[in-house]
């Protein structure tokens, strides 16, 4: 029989999993997500992507500020769920919540654990130059992404991929993986494996202060830094435009031939020298403007060879 599930998630990454579980006949007893936040020009309250998806499913939506009260625990238990599925919820579950569903709580995590436990695994895998990443379903325990692993899928990370590309691919893969995991749980055949104690790394939350591009680094590291932060918060540099430094977010680039002083524009196509090698910018964004190709940008704002990027 299909499982009765509580789903807990917040961003767009979690939506495919919620929809897939519902499409496969599981009973979504309740959807927990974060509270609406003001956004946009009018700063109107906007519900999370998961809340909007839950409304389409006509599933009850709950946005508790905390799960650490007796009332929150009683409300959670009242759903009488067989299991909970957690995907980027954004709130730590206390042990009492983890213990509430008869079959446990299962998390979809966007890395190949134990590498990149924590808040920003997709970004950190790209920025570190990893050749691959993936998604894993684990049975949650009280630790930070330390639970026993049930299933995993891997993907290659190419130099052309931004965090958006990785995000979208893993969100789709993860939805299928969780459906398979819940089917195995339903049959009583979900196999769990303890995580290795070797190779543990932590994916710290992205800080806007680390977004500035350091062209003294090798070209591959500059590229991965840019792609690991695209589109948000966006890796940035300053270009001299009409005698003034203007902050530009670089959204996409490629490794290019050529050498020069780090930060030097070495041709007419916005190729910028790095500590070793060079990158060619292919997509960028000025403050308050829509993203554009480098070609579109250069038509309106020529950048001469020899200019230094800050």
From Swiss-Prot:
Group of enzyme by EC: transferase
Gene field: fmt
Family matches, as Gene3D superfamilies: 3.40.50.12230
Function: Attaches a formyl group to the free amino group of methionyl-tRNA(fMet). The formyl group appears to play a dual role in the initiator identity of N-formylmethionyl-tRNA by promoting its recognition by IF2 and preventing the misappropriation of this tRNA by the elongation apparatus.
Reaction it catalyzes: L-methionyl-tRNA(fMet) + (6R)-10-formyltetrahydrofolate = N-formyl-L-methionyl-tRNA(fMet) + (6S)-5,6,7,8-tetrahydrofolate + H(+)
Listed name of the protein: Methionyl-tRNA formyltransferase
InterPro entries in the cross-refs: Fmt (IPR005794), Formyl_trans_C (IPR005793), Formyl_transf_N (IPR002376), Formyl_transf_N_sf (IPR036477), Formyl_transferase-like_C_sf (IPR011034), GART_AS (IPR001555), Met-tRNA-FMT_C (IPR044135), Met-tRNA-FMT_N (IPR041711)
Lineage start: Bacteria, Pseudomonadati, Pseudomonadota, Alphaproteobacteria, Hyphomicrobiales
Keyword entries, A-Z: Protein biosynthesis, Transferase
EC numbers: 2.1.2.9
Gene Ontology molecular function: methionyl-tRNA formyltransferase activity
Domain of life: Bacteria
UniProt-listed Pfam families: Formyl_trans_C (PF02911), Formyl_trans_N (PF00551)
Family: Belongs to the Fmt family.
Cellular component aspect of the GO annotation: cytosol
Amino acids binding (6S)-5,6,7,8-tetrahydrofolate: 111-114
């Amino acid at each position: 029989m299909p499982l009765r599930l509580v789903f807990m998630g917040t961003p767009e990454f979690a939506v495919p999993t919620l929809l897939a579980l519902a499409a496969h006949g599981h009973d979504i007893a309740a959807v927990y997500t974060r509270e609406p936040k003001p956004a946009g020009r009018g700063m109107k309250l906007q519900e999370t992507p998961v809340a909007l998806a839950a409304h389409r499913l006509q599933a009850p939506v709950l946005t508790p500020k905390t799960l650490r009260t007796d009332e929150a625990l009683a409300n959670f238990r009242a759903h009488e769920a067989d299991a909970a599925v957690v995907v980027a919820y954004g709130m730590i579950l206390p042990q009492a919540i983890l213990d509430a569903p008869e079959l446990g709580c299962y998390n979809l995590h966007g890395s190949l654990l134990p590498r990149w436990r924590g808040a920003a695994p997709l970004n950190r895998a790209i920025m570190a130059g990893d050749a691959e990443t993936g998604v894993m379903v684990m049975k949650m325990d009280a630790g930070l992404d330390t639970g026993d692993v049930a299933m995993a899928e891997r993907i290659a990370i190419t130099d052309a991929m931004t965090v958006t590309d990785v995000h979208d691919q893993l969100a789709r893969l993860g939805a299928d993986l969780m459906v398979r995991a819940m089917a195995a749980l339903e049959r009583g055949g979900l196999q769990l494996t303890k995580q290795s104690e070797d190779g543990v790394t932590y994916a710290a939350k992205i800080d806007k202060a680390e977004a500035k591009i350091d062209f003294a680094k090798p070209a591959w590291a500059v590229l991965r830094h840019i792609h690991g932060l695209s589109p948000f918060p966006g890796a940035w540099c300053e270009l001299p435009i009409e005698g003034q430094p203007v902050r530009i977010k670089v959204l996409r680039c490629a490794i290019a031939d050529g050498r020069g002083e780090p930060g030097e524009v070495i041709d007419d196509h916005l190729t910028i020298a790095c500590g070793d090698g060079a990158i060619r910018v292919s997509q960028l964004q000025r403050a308050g403007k829509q993203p554009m190709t480098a070609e579109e940008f250069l038509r309106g704002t020529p950048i001469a060879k020899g200019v230094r990027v800050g």
